[in-house]
Amino acid sequence: MARRPPPYAWLGPGVVLGGLLPTVFLLWDALSGGLGANPVKQATHQTGQLALIVLTLSLACTPARVWLGWTWAARIRKALGLLAAFYAVLHFGIYLRGQDFSLGRIWEDVTERPFITSGFAALLLLLPLVLTSGKGSVRRLGFARWTLLHRLVYLAAALGALHYWWGVKKDHSGPLLAVLVLAALGLARLKTPARLNRPARQ
């Protein structure tokens, strides 16, 4: 007798497919001239905002499961986290293109411009989380150490919000909203019992 798939098994793949749609629209805009006079700058902004939005949604999954009873939210947390990392890498890649892949200019930016430093640090923090996102990593590291490592996502999100704030010159309503939402999610996480933070079965 064939095993029935677990409830909401389609959610993870569905989130990934849906979450990749903005890249299709971005590519279309790039090819059709829809990104304006400075397409690299516009694409950099769009992918950076997408990375922070999707990362924030991933952080909302545990509070949604614990406090609202939305058990399905746990099944999309990993997919959202990987999507956020994808957009962060894409954001950085477009920035590199804007710098003509000049290592000297990039190093100068990273070491002398806090705006770039914060974004680069956020990206570096996300990479080990991606590499240890599988169930095998939980077994190898042990749940306690794995959990401690993956709490770095909150620091990465905070640095991403700071990067966003410093990157906006006039209207800070968007960065301010990001900071407030992340602060609320961090507080919700602190009030979540540790036993309820285990990764959901995929």
Curated annotation (Swiss-Prot):
Q: Name one GO molecular function term.
A: metal ion binding
Co-factor binding details:
Binds 1 FMN per subunit. Binds 1 heme b (iron(II)-protoporphyrin IX) group per subunit.
> Which InterPro entries did the record assign?
Fe3_Rdtase_TM_dom, MsrQ-like
User: Which processes are annotated in GO (biological process)?
Assistant: protein repair
Summarize subunit and interaction data from the UniProt record for this chain: Heterodimer of a catalytic subunit (MsrP) and a heme-binding subunit (MsrQ).
- Function, in words: Part of the MsrPQ system that repairs oxidized cell envelope proteins containing methionine sulfoxide residues (Met-O), using respiratory chain electrons. Thus protects these proteins from oxidative-stress damage caused by reactive species of oxygen and chlorine. MsrPQ is essential for the maintenance of envelope integrity under bleach stress, rescuing a wide series of structurally unrelated cell envelope proteins from methionine oxidation. MsrQ provides electrons for reduction to the reductase catalytic subunit MsrP, using the quinone pool of the respiratory chain.
Please report the name of this protein according to its UniProt entry: Protein-methionine-sulfoxide reductase heme-binding subunit MsrQ
State the organism's lineage.
Bacteria, Thermotogati, Deinococcota, Deinococci, Deinococcales
Gene it is expressed from: msrQ
